[in-house]
Amino acid sequence: MSRGRADTAGDCSKNGRRSRILHYLMAIYLLNGLPGGEYARFIKIARLLDVSPSTVSIMTRRLQMKGLVELIPNMGVRLTEQGLKILSNYLWKSAILEVLLARAGVDIDNCRGMGLRMAEGLSDEDAWILYKVLGEPKYCPHKKPIIPPDEINAENARQIALCCGISILQIPNNRLQPPS
């Protein structure tokens, strides 16, 4: 893949819908639902997102139709390579924005949430420009590795959440509760 404009938005053009998609992809990721890995159970996703299991069922079927998840009845759901690509692109943008904000003097504790909120509105093209202007940073302000989205695969995917110290509670526009 070239480092130009990646087609990661897919059918996620509306902000609200895209935000919901990112919430589900993040929840599945946090429950170890990586490509070729474990399956995240609907009930655990429902608890994490504070929605009903039937809502999870409906949304994951939609994600499956978009090619973002693999869904196995009575097993659960896990990300496809395409779903991982969309999620990793979002988290990479967030990390780049964290670096920019930290260099601009924003308190490191505020960078994380601000970066996540701003990442949804940042185009792929603009993110690559920022990445280059910032000197292709290797670490976020929290000293976690930044992995460009074109270098993410199922083997190193576990590191992307660490890039921003991500927690499901920091995804913008959420109604999420801490996992129990």
Swiss-Prot record:
Keywords: DNA-binding, Transcription, Transcription regulation
Gene Ontology molecular function: DNA binding; DNA-binding transcription factor activity; protein dimerization activity; transition metal ion binding
Pfam families associated with the record: Fe_dep_repr_C (PF02742), Fe_dep_repress (PF01325)
Disulfide bonds: none
HTH dtxR-type domain segment(s): 17-80
SUPFAM superfamilies reported for this sequence: Iron-dependent repressor protein, dimerization domain (SSF47979), Winged helix' DNA-binding domain (SSF46785)
Gene3D superfamilies xref list: Winged helix-like DNA-binding domain superfamily/Winged helix DNA-binding domain
Family in the record: Belongs to the DtxR/MntR family.
Name listed for the protein in its UniProt record: Uncharacterized HTH-type transcriptional regulator APE_0142
